[in-house]
Amino acid sequence: MPQLSRYSDERVEELLTELASVLSKHKAPTDLSLMVLGNMVTNVINNSVAPAQRKTLARSFAEALQSSIRDDNAH
């Protein structure tokens, strides 16, 4: 079941496009891109979420990431 978001698809896509553009501009390979994005997620959680909620949010984020990964062969 899709999650409802308080943010519009347009706003999400705009941010995604900008982030992808920065990674492309720096010719970041997949491993570096994942490292940087992972560090960004960690930074957001550590600086914007109450300490008591961090582990729960990180677990939920990881589960959402796992559920969004496709099993097909597309690149």
UniProtKB/Swiss-Prot annotation:
Gene3D superfamilies: YejL-like. InterPro entries: UPF0352 (IPR009857), YejL_sf (IPR023202). It comes from the Bacteria. It holds the Pfam family DUF1414. Belongs to the UPF0352 family. This is UPF0352 protein ESA_01049. The lineage of its organism: Bacteria, Pseudomonadati, Pseudomonadota, Gammaproteobacteria, Enterobacterales.
